[in-house]
């Protein structure tokens, strides 16, 4: 990869600015010894990543930033208004993962159904204050896993059908052999 010096006339966009702020917050947590977190959270291989959709939430629980991918996920669950400046609860969005991350001061990964037949996987990482035990906010990464869960259910249904056919063929063969 190439590293270039920033152009003097170039102003960063909102996405770049927010990601840089999040990076700076994580570096201050690392310097204070508060990141990475001591406990591991489940299987992180399928957990949302920063490119899936990002929502930053401040210490008061108000949405401060929503990335374009997160905005698309919110639209799929029926939230069409601009969420910036409101709480997730006011929007009718499940805010349990955020509350759990703040209460435990540890990352939380939760999958839940939101709206009509939409399944979201959320990873909420508390942004700890490097100077004290407070929480400055939460970084919520979300992924729409509706299609993946639909395929899982379809696979389970096909598996049950194959088991039933196998059972019937086995019974027929036993009848013929006796």
What are these regions (language model features)?
Residues 51-53, 57, 155, 163, ...:
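Signal-transmission coiled-coils
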Residues 1-3, 87, 93-147:
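PAS-family sensory/regulatory modules and their coupling/dimerization elements
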Residues 2-40, 127-168:
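Sensory coupling linkers of modular signal transduction proteins
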Residues 169-177:
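Short post-phosphohistidine helix in the DHp/HisKA domain of histidine kinases
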Residues 5, 59-62, 80-85:
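N-terminal functional module detector in eukaryotic proteins
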Residues 71-89:
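PAS and related sensory helical modules
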Residues 82, 143, 178:
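Short acidic (Asp/Glu) and glycine-rich catalytic loops that position anionic groups and cofactors
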């Amino acid at each position: 990869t190439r590293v270039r010096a920033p152009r003097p006339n170039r102003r960063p966009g909102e996405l770049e600015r927010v990601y840089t702020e999040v990076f700076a917050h994580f570096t201050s947590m690392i310097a204070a010894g508060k990141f990475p977190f001591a406990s591991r959270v489940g299987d992180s291989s399928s957990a949302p990543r920063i490119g899936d959709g990002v929502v930053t939430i401040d210490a008061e629980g108000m949405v401060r930033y929503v990335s374009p991918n997160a905005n698309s996920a919110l639209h799929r669950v029926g939230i069409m208004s601009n969420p910036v400046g409101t709480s997730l609860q006011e929007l009718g969005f499940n805010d349990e993962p955020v509350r759990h991350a703040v209460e435990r001061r540890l990352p939380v990964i939760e999958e839940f159904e939101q709206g009509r037949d939409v399944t979201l996987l959320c990873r909420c990482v508390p942004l700890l204050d490097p100077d004290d035990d407070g929480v400055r906010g939460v970084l919520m990464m979300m992924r729409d896993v509706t299609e993946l869960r639909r395929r899982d259910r379809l696979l389970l249904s096909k598996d049950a059908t194959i088991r039933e056919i196998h059972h019937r063929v086995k019974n027929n063969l036993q009848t013929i052999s006796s």
